[in-house]
Amino acid sequence: MIRKAFVMQVNPDAHEEYQRRHNPIWPELEAVLKSHGVHNYAIYLDKARNLLFAMVEIESEERWNAVASTDVCQRWWKYMTDVMPANPDNSPVSSELQEVFYLP
């Protein structure tokens, strides 16, 4: 399993809405993530800094990257653009983090 972590931002007035939209996520999005080898995906909110910290385990980078081209992912990204900064393709602005410690 490959562990990944990344940070995103959420608009200051959208914390509750962001959480509402994820509980639960669309069943079809969950199905796409699972079918693409995504496991143990968690997102945490730092309210003071409007930061989202995400951790995920994936089976392969290729399958993880393929999620972005699915119709359901494209619709999800568009759905989320009013609650968080987005790139021109509607993907969330994010920065990948480097793992510096892991205790199995």
Swiss-Prot record:
Cited InterPro entries: Dimeric_a/b-barrel (IPR011008), L-rhamnose_mutarotase (IPR013448), Rham/fucose_mutarotase (IPR008000)
Active site: H22 (proton donor)
Gene Ontology molecular function: L-rhamnose mutarotase activity
Catalytic activity entry: alpha-L-rhamnose = beta-L-rhamnose
Keywords: Carbohydrate metabolism, Cytoplasm, Isomerase, Rhamnose metabolism
Family: Belongs to the rhamnose mutarotase family.
Protein name listed in UniProt: L-rhamnose mutarotase
Gene: rhaM
